[in-house]
Amino acid sequence: MGDTTNFSGDFRGAIVNFKSTLSNVEQSVGAMPTADGAEREELARLVRELSAALESLPDDKGEVAEVLARQTETLVEEAKKDKPNRTMLGISADGLKQAAETVADVAPKVLGVARQIAEFFAKFGGG
């Protein structure tokens, strides 16, 4: 039994969902024992930048916004563990970048911030 996310239906509310998810992620960053204060502030700033960049997405890209928020959440939750799973971090960082690439033509800032977040987690063995 694993965590599976299936997307179907009307995503007009996805904008609210990604904002809520990323707000929770930003709050969770403070609980990362594997990062020092400066690193946590850097990551919190990147999460805020991602949230702002996602707001520029057209309504029909709400599903992608939600995926990006959840991938970021997965990265932070894994990094909060005493012994983060490097494979999980790498796969999640790759997924974050891949999702961002799908909207790079309409929101290039999203891809730039997603890459920075993935690079941040590379120092923990992911990406």
Where are the regions a protein language model picked out?
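Short amphipathic alpha-helical segments that predominantly mediate membrane engagement
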Residues: 1-8, 22-102, 119-127
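Amphipathic alpha-helical hairpins/coiled-coils and adjacent low-complexity
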Residues: 104, 108-111, 115
